[in-house]
């Protein structure tokens, strides 16, 4: 029987060999954390390689994602559908083993990591989801949700500011099933960290309210085993296990040096490591005995079967709860969702209200949350401004309301957004979280990661323009809406009234293949009249709100607007119409959605032969030239805002009927 060290060495040599074959990669972390991984995966991790999506599996997150060959080796050795050929294709085009772990490629990879600090933050989201789901569904004698979240992280993750945001909140919420392993090797890309990272990490995490197990020898299986047992025994606090490790362990000449962090070791050094660790096998060769000891398929199938029996007993005792649990973990919307949400939208159209779109957003949350117990809302300490609370909101605390549906994220925009991604990845919830649009800048990379991972995270942004007013340019978004529109696979909405706001929320809820950004105003907006056809076309991202005639060829001019500027466009159209100009007004709440429509529909809204166009939006002007062309004009922002009442700012920056009419006449 192979020893623990030999089992860990299988990880080390698969990692060395794959990085060497790829001619790039990071061998140091997998070699340094191999002993920790061997103990965790073989002695504790509850998982089934034959079903990577088992609802009650433990979650494992590699926050230091550059060490991706660690998780690929673990998945391969444990019996997941990841072959030795897949490992040989490490970092190659269209392989299942990209340079950093990517969700949706190798089965068993729970989240995309690489941007340091986001993995530990996703893990906090996973742990929140587990705890909340357990309190919502578990009943005495029926614990159908009962799993841990394990995360590996390194010095880089702890240096990133987002780790403070996430770990602070994790301690406050008492996430007892979150267990983190800190790869304390004192090395980063630039060398030994003594020159730039001398924090007392133990005291830092104790101050957060974590249970900390310090000074564990990361190459001593017995110490690691005991540390995990202690961590599991502490159920009221998250645990940080500080593992002293040697980066590149087993490399005679490069271990404990940044030389092995982010580059292949080289053939000579790998040969020396083989001799040093007494590994007599060829590259990518693993003895059958080691494969047999690593194989977790049978153990995993037994564990899942036992859980299925628990679920069957639960279904017998609580049939309605069991059906609801199954619906939610399968990410299915309620049977009455489509009809009820559409009825709400039609009710709004029939009952006009000139309200701020942030208030319209709150009304949509109120209506939809009653249909969607899977909603898990929140705000970055701006609930009274973002208007994210509804009558049934139940804020989650460490002990009270552990079965709640709302998270007070505090002033943690980046942390909130990456936590939401973890919640979405875990399953059972649709997370939404809000802040001012200006502060999406703090969270931009987490929004991008949601889009990359195709997760249904709903990012809510209010106070969307110079309409914010007196708080001034530090708080007034200019380029942010366009920046969001440019993120691939993110659908961004900027609705013009309560109806478009409700449609935007509905579209975001129904979109399973990616996130949405919902952008709302501080100021009141006039509701637009619509026919049934126009109402149906709102969901297409752009539609003709004002016709000048039935003939497609008739417009002299097209005005395109979003959000608070749609009313301006309609008023300008009336002025021009009175002067004999035939004007079409297009409301385009989501350029991303509109661009996905078929060519015939897009042509029906924006006929290519009508080149006289003006776009109006209180955001950066440059974005709109793709719609107005060289002959068109844009009424937009080309500078930062100012501190003044909103009406003065709109006049100052040209968002007036008079200026729109003047711009239009200049091209007619």
UniProtKB/Swiss-Prot annotation:
Signal sequence coordinates: none
Keyword Cytoplasm: no
Pfam family, one: Transket_pyr
Keywords, comma-separated and alphabetical: Calcium, Magnesium, Metal-binding, Thiamine pyrophosphate, Transferase
InterPro entries found in the cross-reference section: THDP-binding, Transketo_C/PFOR_II, Transketolase-like_C_2, Transketolase-like_Pyr-bd, Transketolase_bac-like, Transketolase_BS, Transketolase_CS, Transketolase_fam
Listed GO CC annotations: cytosol
Cofactor: binding comment: Binds 1 Mg(2+) ion per subunit. Can also utilize other divalent metal cations, such as Ca(2+), Mn(2+) and Co(2+). Binds 1 thiamine pyrophosphate per subunit.
UniProt site positions, description: Important for catalytic activity: 26, 261
Subunit organization: Homodimer.
Function: Catalyzes the transfer of a two-carbon ketol group from a ketose donor to an aldose acceptor, via a covalent intermediate with the cofactor thiamine pyrophosphate.
Protein name: Transketolase 1
Organism name: Pasteurella multocida (strain Pm70)
